[in-house]
């Protein structure tokens, strides 16, 4: 499959870089959280509140199965999608996985800078929770095909495109 799959922590820039990559490569952008919101006709926050996290993770698995048929897409995943049900391996079969690595200190700055009411796992700007999440997820994220330190927007885009072309053998 010739897709680019962006993974990483919440606030790592997956949606922002995904939008720009889709323009550069002339690929459609798929945001897994947006797809789930459209399927359920509810926000992620509402889904978590009404049905719980397990239900949400089941919906992510449904999305992964749909994505197996896609090609020439930039896929921006929710931060937890690669973590559950060994989804990282499914994502690697869907396309070229890119872990957008952002230092924890930078993630905390980004979280504190804004109120993230739409992100149920980041409610109350709980830096300790973010730190725990980071520690628990990093090992799985690092199984991606490539790791891009996303502290500079333009540099990250260039590195992702180069790594993707190399992976494709171009």
From Swiss-Prot:
Catalytic activity: shikimate + ATP = 3-phosphoshikimate + ADP + H(+)
Pathway(s) where this gene product acts: Metabolic intermediate biosynthesis; chorismate biosynthesis; chorismate from D-erythrose 4-phosphate and phosphoenolpyruvate: step 5/7
Cofactor(s) demanded: Mg(2+)
CC cofactor note: Binds 1 Mg(2+) ion per subunit.
Keywords: Amino-acid biosynthesis, Aromatic amino acid biosynthesis, ATP-binding, Cytoplasm, Kinase, Magnesium, Metal-binding, Nucleotide-binding, Transferase
Chief location bin: cytoplasm
EC number: 2.7.1.71
UniProt-annotated binding residues for Mg(2+): 15
Gene Ontology cellular-component annotations: cytosol
Binding site for substrate: 33, 57, 79, 137
Pfam families, alphabetized: SKI
Segments forming a coiled coil: none
Chain positions recorded as ATP binding sites: 11-16, 119
Gene Ontology biological process terms from the UniProt entry: amino acid biosynthetic process; aromatic amino acid family biosynthetic process; chorismate biosynthetic process
Location of the protein in the cell: Cytoplasm
Keyword flag Metal-binding: yes
Function field: Catalyzes the specific phosphorylation of the 3-hydroxyl group of shikimic acid using ATP as a cosubstrate.
Family affiliation: Belongs to the shikimate kinase family.
Protein name: Shikimate kinase
Record gene name: aroK
């Amino acid at each position: 499959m010739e897709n680019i799959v962006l993974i990483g922590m919440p606030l790592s820039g997956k949606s922002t870089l995904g939008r720009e990559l889709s323009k550069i490569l002339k690929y459609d952008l798929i945001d897994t959280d947006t797809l789930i919101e459209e399927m359920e006709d509810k926000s992620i926050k509402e889904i978590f509140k009404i049905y719980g996290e397990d239900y949400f993770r089941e919906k992510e698995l449904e999305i992964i199965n749909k994505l197996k048929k896609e090609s020439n897409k930039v896929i921006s995943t929710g931060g937890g999608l690669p973590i559950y049900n060994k989804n990282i391996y499914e994502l690697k079969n869907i396309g070229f996985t890119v872990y957008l690595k952002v230092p924890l200190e930078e993630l905390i700055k980004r979280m504190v800078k804004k109120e993230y009411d739409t992100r149920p796992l980041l409610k109350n700007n709980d830096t300790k929770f973010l730190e725990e999440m980071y520690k628990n997820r990093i090992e799985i994220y690092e199984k991606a095909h490539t790791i891009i330190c996303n502290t500079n927007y333009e540099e990250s885009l260039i590195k992702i495109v180069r790594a993707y072309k190399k992976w494709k053998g171009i």
